A protein has these predicted regions:
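Conserved phosphate-coupling serine/threonine residues in phosphotransfer and NTP-handling enzymes
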Residues: 13, 112-114
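Conserved SAM-binding loop
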Residues: 14, 91, 108, 163, ...
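Structured helix-beta-strand junction loops
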Residues: 50, 104-105, 159
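Short, acidic loop-to-helix structural element flanking the phosphoryl-transfer center
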Residues: 81-110, 146
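N-terminal helical cap/lid subdomain that shapes the substrate entry/recognition surface
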Residues: 2-93
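Short beta->alpha linker loops
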Residues: 20, 90-94, 114-115, 140, ...
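Asp-based, Mg2+/Mn2+-dependent phosphohydrolase catalytic module
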Residues: 1-4, 116, 120-207
């Protein structure tokens, strides 16, 4: 692969956390007597990749703002605790082995639209921390994913890279950032365009 650096999305690219996220949210909702707002894994399929406020506007639309965003924050905190303690393997096949091999020739990074702590949680659970040289998320920057990609590039002096993601939002972020898009076709979305496609994570070794 010709790119000096590779930047990865998380959900739908490195792992599928939908079931654990839904379970974590529902634990918090039950604690607050809000089980009527319970969510399920499939609800998150079209939402992963969006920023937290956009997700809250959909799943907690019946809760007035700004209370819905405060509720979202509490659910995400519980989600992180729940996922940290859950030993279920939610990584896509071959992620750790592929990243280890890629790290021998490329610098590897993560950019996500997630809350703070989520990239670290992903790296810890998948055992990929030794291979990731840096990460940024919406919780860090408060900006669009495209701008967050640019911020990461500036921070780490990245001039030649590609972004690996799965959704239309990821594709649009690469257009904003001005970088190639490698589509993880096994993920959650169908983007309008891409520069290369992978049908399984290990396909990255063959590009």
């Amino acid at each position: 692969m010709r790119y000096e650096s590779l930047i990865f999305d998380i959900d739908g690219t490195l792992w599928d956390s939908r079931q654990l996220v839904a379970e974590g949210y529902n634990i918090q909702l039950a604690k607050e007597g809000l089980s009527h707002l319970a969510v399920n894994a499939e609800l998150f399929r079209p939402l992963f990749g969006k920023v937290m406020t956009e997700i809250a506007d959909v799943i907690f639309s019946s809760v007035p703002a700004p209370e819905r965003y405060e509720l979202m924050k509490r659910c995400m905190d519980e989600e992180n605790r729940y996922m940290h303690n859950n030993e279920c393997n939610i990584g896509y096949p071959g992620v750790r082995e592929t990243l280890k091999k890629l790290s021998e020739k490329h610098r590897l990074f993560i950019v996500s639209n997630s809350q703070q702590g989520y990239p670290e949680l992903c790296m810890e659970k998948l055992g990929i921390s030794p291979y990731i040289q840096g990460h940024l998320c919406f919780g860090d920057t408060g900006t669009t994913k495209g701008q967050t990609i640019r911020t990461l590039m500036e921070k780490y002096n990245i001039t030649d890279c590609a972004y690996i993601g799965d959704t239309q939002g990821d594709y649009e972020a690469t257009l904003e950032a001005g970088v190639p898009f490698l589509w993880a076709a096994y993920g959650f979305g169908t983007p309008a365009g891409y520069d290369a496609r992978i049908d399984q994570f290990s396909d990255l070794l063959n590009l």
